[in-house]
Amino acid sequence: MANIPSAKKRARQAEKRRKHNQSQRSMMRTYIKRVVNAIKAGDKAQAEEAYKVAVPVIDRMATRGLIHKNKAARHKSRLNQHLRNLQG
């Protein structure tokens, strides 16, 4: 544990940021799961609506550095691919 006051403050801030980032990543995963569950159910309209909501969230997480931009692109690409397969 830190002894210097500034180090204690840094530790508090880091823990606070970790919890916030963790909740943001969890939220993103929830949006992705909504799309996946709609696709599995075969509900095209609900899947498209969930996808439209999930994409900006995924992009925001990449912009903020919570996930890598390539991971964001991979998520969006795979979800979109599943949506296209659902239609045809």
Curated annotation (Swiss-Prot):
Keyword DNA-binding part of the UniProt annotation: no
PANTHER family: 30S RIBOSOMAL PROTEIN S20, SMALL RIBOSOMAL SUBUNIT PROTEIN BS20C
Pfam families (UniProt xref): Ribosomal_S20p
Keywords: Ribonucleoprotein, Ribosomal protein, RNA-binding, rRNA-binding
Protein's GO biological process: translation
GO molecular function annotations of the record: small ribosomal subunit rRNA binding; structural constituent of ribosome
Protein name, UniProt field: Small ribosomal subunit protein bS20
InterPro entries: Ribosomal_bS20, Ribosomal_bS20_sf
Gene expressing this chain: rpsT
Lineage of origin: Bacteria, Pseudomonadati, Pseudomonadota, Gammaproteobacteria, Chromatiales
HAMAP family found in the cross-reference section: Ribosomal_bS20 (MF_00500)
Function recorded in the entry: Binds directly to 16S ribosomal RNA.
Region (Disordered): 1-27
Annotated family: Belongs to the bacterial ribosomal protein bS20 family.
Organism: Alkalilimnicola ehrlichii (strain ATCC BAA-1101 / DSM 17681 / MLHE-1)
Gene Ontology CC, one term: cytosol
Bias type Basic residues, positions: 7-22
